[in-house]
Amino acid sequence: MSRRGFTVIELLVSLAIIGLLLALLLPAVQAVRETARRAQCQNNLKQIGLAILEYESEHGVLPNGSGLRYDLLPYLGLTSIHSQYDPLIPPTPNNPEVAWARVKPNLIPLYVCPSDHVSPGGQWEAATSYPSCFGSGLLVNGFDGAFGLWGYTYLGHTSNPVRMSDITDGTSNVAAVGEWLYGDFRPKRLRARWILPSMYGTTEVEAFRDACETLPADPPAYGYQSINRRGFPWCFGSLGMGQYNHMLPPNRPSCSGAGVVPTGIYTAGSQHPGGAHLLFVDGHVAFQSENIDRRVWQHLGSRNDGAAVSSP
């Protein structure tokens, strides 16, 4: 009895068919996985939104933007991490944040979008994908968002605690927390904050915004300097590090003028195709297109500008 095996040609044809099937199936599998990651990211924001509302119900004000994610820990079942901050440890010249030493390394999955494949750290400090919104734009008009830096004053405007009654544009129309791509300590266009070489005055908002939006694809090749720690550590909320604004729509660069950090453009973004999620003060989450009208996006960042816009 003769035995019939595969010929070389048959084997090659079989391998080609298998390769073709894999090429057809792989994008579908990847799309399904991204859909699941996107849903988890949205759920993370919903959980944060519920915690914000619980905090407001107990304290009568929204949390301080400078410590939002830390202050929400007890409302997320993470009291054990919250208690690791030790205010009795005095700062030192070499380590002014020593009281936070045990808090910063904690990697909190709820604070990281699973679609972001860059490591959020964890050895010395961990990052967050979810910055709080301090307003519609530059601070020339003060902190007009849901959050800010309590007691901080800039150009005569002081950031004070925000009550629900202060949100006159409606809690369903005002941004609370967005998404962004946290830094990976390397100069990447949408992960870093870029220092524009020119100084921009308070009357040059449009010029500043245009210069940031048209940043080259490879900024370091053109001599641009950057700060690459956006989102680190998760428990802090300084402007551009833990808080963002609505100067530019999602997936645009972030910039500051030379020597004028508080007037920076700190932009939302994500690795979801086409845009980013946005948590509103009332707790609902909606996906925002990166092609959203710039004016609509900016109005969503303000709690009281009187514009008649609603969440897309």
Short names for language-model regions:
Residues M1-S2, L300:
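Polar low-complexity intrinsically disordered regions
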Residues S2-R37:
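N-terminal single-pass transmembrane signal-anchor helix
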Residues A31-P312:
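Internal low-complexity, small-residue/proline-rich segments
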